[in-house]
Amino acid sequence: MSIPADIASLISDKYKSAFDNGNLKFIQTETTKTKDPKTSMPYLISHMPSLIEKPERGQTPEGEDPLGKPEEELTVIPEFGGADNKAYKLLLNKFPVIPEHTLLVTNEYQHQTDALTPTDLLTAYKLLCALDNEESDKRHMVFYNSGPASGSSLDHKHLQILQMPEKFVTFQDRLCNGKEHFLPTFNTEPLQDAKVSFAHFVLPMPESEETVDEDLLAMCYISILQRALTFFQDWLNENPELKKSYNLMLTKEWICVVPRSKAFSDEMKIGFNSTGYCGMILTKNDEVFSKITEKPELINDILLECGFPNTSGQKPNEYNY
């Protein structure tokens, strides 16, 4: 697993060059930190009109694979990771939600509905370890939007990596604070915050990076993914069109899976991917930005509309695990 020691500066230099040359678009007009008065869930709401230009799912011409095309101006590392050290490439996101937003892309075409492999997970975790910097308070998150209702816009398998906003504490951080790493059993469920509306499954990660390997990551991922996928069995009668979709988020501190029922809220004309389910809300529309900054409790309702009801306190057999 050879991730260059200077990976942070490689990303930074490539981003500066791509930004200066107009190869990517980043325009953020306003950011507001707020909190839901009922659930205490913290939100960082960013208004980003530049995202209007980002293609949505279904807008890419059939048969086209934008992530398969070589784009030297966006490529940080063309080949690394995996058994042959050629399994992945690291690209800059053409439509970054924060500066230096990157994509971990499989060099061989795989589908975004495919499960993550142990190698995918370990490569992502190693990137987190290389990029996080306690001295400068830099912390990163990897996320994977899988399935048509997850907020993913491209079919070529890719994970995304972004730096967490400074001093932003997610509800997953609070949930795992002071908790030791564990794997769920029939008697011990993954963590859920009973106050938030939507189903989510969270496990604390081990404190020591050295104890984290492919097996541990795969066991964490599979155990919470299985619980998320039970919702699709339970709800198929009610909604036969439902396609398996979920968001996965991984930091050095925790791993989280959120099952998804819809990519967009009909109620509010806003879409979410993984970032929304840890409180980072992106808006393209002025009216939506005004509404949710004035009444942040609306976000809890629309996150539920696009997810499934919270099962906190229920045993697996109570939701057909």
Curated annotation (Swiss-Prot):
The record marks 160 as: Transition state stabilizer. GO terms for cellular component: cytoplasm; nucleus. The modification Phosphothreonine is found at residue 60. Its EC number is 2.7.7.53, 2.7.7.5. Its main location: cytoplasm. It is an enzyme of class 2 (transferase). Pfam families: Ap4A_phos_N (PF19327), ATP_transf (PF09830). Gene3D superfamilies: 3.30.428.70. The keyword Secreted does not apply. One of its GO terms (biological process) is nucleotide biosynthetic process. Substrate binds at residues 54, 93-94, 145, 151-154, 160, 273-275, 280, 284. The N-terminus is blocked. It comes from the Eukaryota. Residues 50-70 are annotated as: Disordered. The active site is at residue 158. One of its GO terms (molecular function) is ATP binding. Its cofactor is a divalent metal cation. Disruption phenotype: Inactivation of both APA1 and APA2 promotes a great increase in the cellular concentration of bis(5'-nuceleosidyl) tetraphosphate nucleotides. Keywords: ATP-binding, Cytoplasm, Hydrolase, Nucleotide-binding, Nucleotidyltransferase, Nucleus, Phosphoprotein, Transferase. Monomer. Present with 19600 molecules/cell in log phase SD medium. PANTHER family: AP-4-A PHOSPHORYLASE II, PUTATIVE (AFU_ORTHOLOGUE AFUA_5G14690)-RELATED. Ap4A phosphorylase catalyzes the phosphorolytic degradation of bis(5'-adenosyl) tetraphosphate (Ap4A) into ADP and ATP. Can also use other Np4N' nucleotides (where N and N' stand for A,C,G or U) as substrates with equal efficiency. Cannot catalyze the reverse reaction. Additionally, this enzyme can also catalyze the phosphorolytic degradation of adenosine 5'-phosphosulfate (AMPS) into ADP and sulfate, the reversible exchange reaction between inorganic phosphate and the beta-phosphate of a nucleoside diphosphate (NDP), and the synthesis of Ap4A from AMPS plus ATP. Belongs to the ATP adenylyltransferase family. This is Protein APA1. It comes from Saccharomyces cerevisiae (strain ATCC 204508 / S288c).
